[in-house]
Swiss-Prot record:
Composition skew (Polar residues), residue ranges: 125-135
Keywords carried by this UniProt record: Calcium, Decarboxylase, Endosome, Golgi apparatus, Lipid biosynthesis, Lipid metabolism, Lyase, Membrane, Metal-binding, Phospholipid biosynthesis, Phospholipid metabolism, Pyruvate, Repeat, Zymogen
Composition-biased stretches (Basic and acidic residues): 293-305
Cellular compartments per GO CC: endosome; endosome membrane; Golgi membrane; Golgi stack
Catalytic activity: a 1,2-diacyl-sn-glycero-3-phospho-L-serine + H(+) = a 1,2-diacyl-sn-glycero-3-phosphoethanolamine + CO2
PTM per Swiss-Prot/TrEMBL: Is synthesized initially as an inactive proenzyme. Formation of the active enzyme involves a self-maturation process in which the active site pyruvoyl group is generated from an internal serine residue via an autocatalytic post-translational modification. Two non-identical subunits are generated from the proenzyme in this reaction, and the pyruvate is formed at the N-terminus of the alpha chain, which is derived from the carboxyl end of the proenzyme.
Organism superkingdom: Eukaryota
Name of the protein in question: Phosphatidylserine decarboxylase proenzyme 2
Species per Swiss-Prot/TrEMBL record: Saccharomyces cerevisiae (strain ATCC 204508 / S288c) (Baker's yeast)
Cellular localization per UniProt: Golgi apparatus membrane; Endosome membrane
Residue numbers binding Ca(2+): 571, 574, 577
Domain C2 intervals: 1-122, 478-600
UniProt-listed PANTHER family: PHOSPHATIDYLSERINE DECARBOXYLASE (PTHR10067), PHOSPHATIDYLSERINE DECARBOXYLASE PROENZYME 2 (PTHR10067:SF17)
Amino acid sequence: MRIIKGRKRGKNKKPTLILKIHVIQAENIEALKTFNCNPVCFVTTNTFYSQKTNKLKNSNTHWNQTLRIKLPRNPTSEWLRIIVYDALPTGAPPTTPSRPRTTTANTSSSTLSNSGLSSHSHSSRNLNVTSKGNQTSTSINSVSSSATPAPSHSSSSLSTTGPGSTHKNRINSYLYLGEAKISLLDLFKRKDTTTSYKFSIEAQRYHLYDMKGGKDQDSLNCNFLVGDILLGFKLECNVKRTPTFQAFNAWRNELNTYLGRIDRNKARMRSSSSLPPPLEDMLSNSSAVSGNEIRREKPYSDTDLAHDEEVNAEDEIDAEESIEDMNSSGSICTERRYDIDNDTIFDSISEVVSLNDEELDILNDFEEADHPNVPDINVHDIDEDTRISLSSMITALDEYDIVEPEDVAKLPAVSENDITSVDDEESENQQESDEEFDIYNEDEREDSDFQSKEYIGSRLLHLQRGKHNKSYANYLYRRAKSNFFISKKEHAMGVVFMHIGAIKNLPALRNRLSKTNYEMDPFIVISFGRRVFKTSWRKHTLNPEFNEYAAFEVFPHETNFAFSIKVVDKDSFSFNDDVAKCELAWFDMLQQQQHENEWIPYEIPLDLTVEPAHAPKQPVLYSSFKYVSYPFLKKSFWKEAVDTSVNLERLDIIQVMLYLERLGSFTMADSFELFQHFNKSAWAGQSITRSQLVEGLQSWRKSTNFKRIWTCPRCMRSCKPTRNARRSKLVLENDLITHFAICTFSKEHKTLKPSYVSSAFASKRWFSKVLIKLTYGKYALGSNNANILVQDRDTGIIIEEKISAHVKLGMRIIYNGKSPESKKFRSLLKTLSIRQGKKFDSTASAKQIEPFIKFHSLDLSQCRDKDFKTFNEFFYRKLKPGSRLPESNNKEILFSPADSRCTVFPTIQESKEIWVKGRKFSIKKLANNYNPETFNDNNCSIGIFRLAPQDYHRFHSPCNGTIGKPVYVDGEYYTVNPMAVRSELDVFGENIRVIIPIDSPQFGKLLYIPIGAMMVGSILLTCKENDVVESGQELGYFKFGGSTIIIIIPHNNFMFDSDLVKNSSERIETLVKVGMSIGHTSNVNELKRIRIKVDDPKKIERIKRTISVSDENAKSTGNVTWEYHTLREMMNKDFAGL
């Protein structure tokens, strides 16, 4: 049972096929008989899925080992290669007595030189690969020899020096002997029939060929047969519930799809470039498998795989070949692969054996990254006068293709203009003007990863330019999207700068054990909405001096918030103690500032929260504030930017170009425009002054909208939020104007960072934070944890709902496991809910009213009635007329249906990603398949309103309209607590509910769904079908328990309020009341909320009690909820006789 819900690895991944190769022995290899060798066998499908046998001595080839390799989930080739090498003695030079000596030269990049080779010549190649960290140095030298051994075989020795070696200069060299190449598509076919497969192959002999020496032959012959190897195979699936047959079918379809796409791309290339078709690949060299190949035209189903017909097809060229200079017919084209995750290029022929044992193990354990589909080749723009002579071009060959020099000379010269791209139209669509290509559009979704661009077998080297050009364009686009932007729709009103100076006259605290006074170690926690700052602490002082600063943005919906300041005493081992607190309204601070960019000093008296409550002198916080508006910052941006980053008085064209290039995307022509603006000749040595540069940038069209600015002019960095900012999910300072203001201010002042979720969490000790994370989950805005954070919409106060520790832990264990889906658990919840409802309908339950009011500190001044006969009558109590009036008379405003904690999502997909984690959650299931053409996951927005037991439990109409026929849906009684909603259980789709259609003239038809929950007796409606209701009119009520109301509305003509959407995207519930605006049609603007100034501590405490319970009441009841005591009494009575 998991306490903390983590990410399930591999849940959505395809099953992996495990191929077991039983390598028994090699036979009839002449080199092993002639020389004293140390044979080793490598088995590989590509660089990352490779294994090798142990190294044997004295030419012994009886390995008798079983190697396990994973088949790639996204295969690009059907071939399995079994390569036999001779492991040369450690430290020995990579040469043999009968071979000419070779020389190696270490260079910083791979160098390849080839020598001529006739059909009777023998080539010796020496590869020296030195790896250190992430740097790889490779040199390959070929030396030809006129000697003609019989039968001759090409040798390839490779030297490696790796960090895992025992000695610093230890060399591991391998001499190539031969290999077998086996098709995985043919390997498991039964020989007696073509309609069935066998995934366990008994040991058979397979021929080993010298592939390097045999490349100049039209077909294999005995001259290049070097021996045999005895192999057995077995294919398995790593997922037990998935049959091997099904997994192999999926793997084969994936491969056929990939190869079919390659075939089509190369066919287009041949037709567009007028080049002759490529040379045919050599067939499989296995003597134990059929030479017939599979035609790759369509995916295979499970039945097709069992009853397939044998057909012939061509063996296509590998899509990932690189281009190598071919000056002779005996040269080897090296296949290269690109590791997206590690940005490391490996040679699949040689570097499979260039890695030491530790590196091979690591590579083999890698999970394969999901490669995107291979794109078609995109050709870069080519000059008209460019001509290409194919006789001097580099040809790209398959591993076994040979092009004779005379064949190359016969190829015609082709103009680059004759080479057309299959994606010209796509490339033109991507090339947009600066005005149309708005890379700062917030509505577009940013891609998280770079797409892999693989070379797909082009015959011309310059065709790769299109790939690099497209990749570079994508890089520029993503870089711009991930950097600063200027939002025209919504930006901060300005930036507030706060100076925390000092505190005077703090009281000496009294030690509870020694009864002596001591000086504290104070620090300050300052919160403004969801931003929480914490100063450093001062040791043993009652008059601490901090001299620290805080700077942050203020948005329009935060103008009614206040600064909450708390002084805390730091303790080394025990919990930190709150000492004093105070409040300062932001609106009051703004009214006292007379001039822009002016510091306003404050002496704020502090209210003590420790004994004695009245010190000899009242503590005072000395601080100052400054507010700078956004228009002022934008107007002075370029002057401050140039003064900060440019020290020269005059700048020439080169200096201007360098400066603009550091800021973002500017061309040489852009720099010329600045000089032309002042009638300056750029290349005549003339220059412009700093003031002219500022003036030009302020009036220049390309700089006034800030689209091309990618880095901060002061720090020259792009927008990369800190780890603490990502953890707390704060409003990221991604606006260039406000970031530059804060960045410039931080250069000269010690500035604090908003790194905490709440002021209570900022004052906790480190071990408390560790314990909370281990038991409840990561304490952060937006994380899936057991901490329920609610923000009051009027004041901006963020408070955590108080739930006892064992209740949190119990709910986390139950709803993250399989218990909720069990029949016994569902039956228990239903029985308890019905029993509790009957109990609270009895007159004896009236005695529970007073403890409930006391525990939740409820204010009953707005209640219409005072006397209640049963607890349920009190629970669904009515309020006095006029207590919950709509905020506006505009009929195109949608209002809150209940006093609740609200989360809203513009799309259903967002709600699934952020809040509702049920596996089977869908609008179709929630609405009981009501009008699925209109109400589905693609067309609707959703609002979720959760009612806690202490809330007013009558629900009201959110708009004007006509009530449709209510549909009652029976279901379960799961809790609607966010911990359960964020589990994999579909709470909303399984619980009891009523579907109420409302036909509104302004919003169209919407669904109003009251949902019952644990301990809810029933859902009662006070409206009937065809009733015409107005905004705020009562529709019904819940009996005892927590509950939820969901509103589903088509989003084609509707938008939720921006502050609710912002909070919901960070998993923060917003406290709303009946009549508050929650959204509007697209015809009207969002309702501007009236600022509510709350200075009275009693009112602030009342808001906190509405969200949670008071500290005193929580402690008096053992820090457990009132429902817990009720359930405990019921359980004690039921099981008293046991």
